[in-house]
């Protein structure tokens, strides 16, 4: 099962990137990679998606364009959008 605290901890190093752009740190990309590893099943993906969405909603300064580019910038094939508006049931 996915624990949102774990997802939050994975994303915390990404906050400066998500709010300011630039290049994500190694710690941030490691976190993105760990979320991908956690989300092994379709249900885990939905749960992780809801955690990511909730985390994104706690930071109103997150730039959606930057957030959506995060997996690409980290070279991680993440099937979970980093967004405040994702419909996680559609994943």
Curated annotation (Swiss-Prot):
Any one GO molecular-function label of the UniProt entry: lipid binding
Keyword list, A-Z: Disulfide bond, Lipid-binding, Transport
Claim: rRNA-binding is one of the keywords in the record: no
Highest taxon listed in the record's lineage: Eukaryota
Expression by tissue: Expressed in seeds (at protein level).
Covalent S-S links between cysteines: 4-51, 14-28, 29-74, 49-88
Entry keyword annotation includes Disulfide bond: yes
InterPro entries xrefs: Bifun_inhib/LTP/seed_sf (IPR036312), Bifunc_inhib/LTP/seed_store (IPR016140), Plant_nsLTP (IPR000528)
Short name of any one Pfam family annotated for the protein: Tryp_alpha_amyl
Alphabetical list of SUPFAM superfamilies matching this protein: Bifunctional inhibitor/lipid-transfer protein/seed storage 2S albumin
Gene Ontology terms: biological process: lipid transport
CDD domains reported for this sequence: nsLTP1
Gene3D superfamilies: Plant lipid-transfer and hydrophobic proteins
SMART domains given in the database record: AAI (SM00499)
Family that this chain belongs to: Belongs to the plant LTP family.
Physiological role: Plant non-specific lipid-transfer proteins transfer phospholipids as well as galactolipids across membranes. May play a role in wax or cutin deposition in the cell walls of expanding epidermal cells and certain secretory tissues. Binds to both saturated and unsaturated lipids, with the highest binding efficiency for linoleic acid, followed by linolenic acid.
Name of this protein: Non-specific lipid-transfer protein 1
């Amino acid at each position: 099962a996915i624990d949102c605290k774990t997802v939050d901890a994975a994303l915390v190093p990404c906050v400066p990137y998500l709010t300011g752009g630039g290049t994500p740190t190694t710690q941030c990309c490691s976190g993105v990679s760990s979320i991908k590893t956690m989300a092994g099943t379709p249900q885990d993906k939905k749960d992780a998606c809801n955690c990511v969405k909730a985390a994104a909603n706690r930071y109103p300064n997150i730039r959606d364009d930057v957030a959506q580019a995060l997996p690409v910038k980290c070279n991680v094939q993440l099937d979970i959008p980093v967004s405040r508006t994702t419909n996680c049931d559609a994943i």
